[in-house]
């Protein structure tokens, strides 16, 4: 297994002091020439060349008490004091990706402070993990910035799945020319099925970012869920409101039931992909991911809950 070492940009960032801010910023640019400009521009929203404004804004960002950034930074150092297990879990995930796709080059990974802006940040060369988005579902300052249903995945142990799934969505992009719900949910469901194979020691609800109760509700009501979708002929609809209702995060999936968790369409896509692989044992994971015909997958899956 190839060991991944996460770069602790967060630690260096928290060593910035107001009295020496200009020098400290220069040091950050020197030590992190690839990540620092991206963090300044994409996370803080400050033009990288505007050093005067950055020297003024950075201490405010680090010491803010209105949104709780100062308290959050201290909490982040506590929660992420030891990241050995985190690095091991991510290493395991990417080792399995490389087994499936040997050409995979593992990006450099950075742990950073996002100001509650970004759990996972990507470009072609690196991955950033917004540590302040994973301080625990019960972290008090989350009440100010997120909805209750979003807190479920704001835990340190959710990071490996978030990183690997984000990487797969980026490297295995949606290529279908169709935009029906069926196509979208099969694409996303296939990716989550693959993530579940990579982290085969995790229960399904952890992969989905749900509670165990939410997962069990879907399993117990799977037939009724499918009947609702089919009766409404939602699979073949292309309206954005329908697609977002089934695929986006939310407190529930209103298209089906107030009791159905958000992103229910992705779960259905996963279940169809799982059934497809069960009934077509000669198909490899790589072939599943490369198959862009959602109608074909649905028909050959023999999915009938």
Show the residue positions of the predicted features.
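Short, solvent-exposed helix-helix connector turns and helix-capping sites enriched
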Residues: 32, 64-66, 293
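Short, mixed-charge, low-aromatic patches
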Residues: 43-54, 146-153, 180-186, 222-232
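N-terminal mature-domain "stem" immediately C-terminal to a signal peptide or N-terminal signal-anchor/transmembrane
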Residues: 1-55, 59
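Acidic/His-rich structured neighborhood in mature extracellular/periplasmic domains
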Residues: 57-215
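Residue-level recognition of alpha-helix termini/interfacial anchor residues
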Residues: 28-39, 43, 73, 216-225, ...
């Amino acid at each position: 297994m190839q060991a991944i070492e996460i770069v602790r940009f967060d630690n260096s960032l928290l060593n910035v002091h107001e009295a020496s801010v200009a020098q400290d910023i220069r040091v950050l640019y020197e030590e992190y020439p690839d990540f620092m400009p991206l963090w300044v521009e994409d996370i803080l929203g400050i033009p990288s060349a505007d050093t005067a404004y950055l020297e003024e804004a950075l201490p405010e960002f680090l010491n803010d008490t209105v949104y709780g950034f100062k308290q959050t930074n201290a909490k982040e150092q506590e929660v992420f004091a030891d990241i050995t297990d985190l690095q091991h879990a991510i290493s395991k995930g990417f080792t399995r990706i490389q087994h499936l796709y040997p050409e995979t080059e593992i990006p450099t990974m950075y742990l950073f402070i996002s100001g509650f802006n970004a759990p996972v940040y990507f470009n072609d060369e690196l991955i950033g993990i917004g540590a302040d988005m994973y301080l625990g579902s019960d972290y008090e300052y989350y009440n100010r910035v997120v909805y209750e249903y979003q807190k479920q995945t704001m835990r340190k142990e959710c990071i490996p799945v978030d990183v690997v799934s984000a990487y797969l969505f980026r490297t295995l992009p949606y290529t279908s020319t169709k935009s029906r719900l069926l196509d979208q949910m099969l694409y996303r469901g296939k990716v989550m099925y693959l993530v579940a194979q990579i982290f085969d020691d995790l229960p399904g609800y952890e992969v989905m970012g749900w509670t165990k109760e939410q997962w069990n509700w879907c399993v117990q009501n799977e037939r009724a869920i499918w009947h609702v979708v089919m009766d409404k002929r939602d699979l073949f609809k292309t309206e954005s409101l329908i697609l977002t209702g089934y695929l986006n995060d939310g407190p529930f999936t209103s298209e089906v039931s107030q009791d159905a968790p958000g992103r229910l369409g992705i779960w259905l896509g996963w279940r169809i992909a799982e059934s497809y692989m069960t009934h077509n044992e000669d198909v490899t994971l790589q072939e599943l991911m490369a198959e862009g015909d959602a109608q074909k997958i649905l028909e050959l899956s023999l999915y009938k809950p």
